[in-house]
Amino acid sequence: MIGGKCEGMPETAKIPIDKVRQLQRKLYVCAKQSRTRRFHALYDRIYRSDVLWEAWRRVRSNGGAAGIDAETIQAIEQRGPGEFLAEIQAALRAGRYRPSPVKRRYIPKADGKQRPLGIPTVRDRVVQMATKLVTEPIFEADFQPCSYGFRPKRSAQQALEVIRVAGNRTFKATSTTSRGKT
């Protein structure tokens, strides 16, 4: 930690997304080349400055309520995200990071029942996002092209479109075959 800032990152610095993307690409390529490869030493990549800054940027853009500690994104912005990220980095590096309990809220459902909702602290969301940034490319390498659930740049609408197109092809092939036989 340097001057209350994330190591190597001035508080006003632009997010070095290119460095994070390079890391992700490298992890993806390694995972794709060998399905049996075991990855070691990923933990130190989670607390890299560029990864934490990108995780913060994504958490900030998602917004959301404060967790059990009542610390909001706005309060962190006022205090300075550099100091906030430096604290996270130091805790992760020293092995002292422990996630906080999740704040539980209930939201009403259309049928009158309630659905439980867990709200993690902003701090925990940043660590979760940093972990996702590092591990996602490794898992992505193993997913099938036909898999759409909870994947980057894929949606339920795209899955439905693939099903619709495949269904049309099957229907046309069946119709053509049926006509040819009669």
What do these predicted regions represent?
Residues 1-8, 13-175, 179-182:
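Conserved pre-catalytic core of RNA-dependent polymerases
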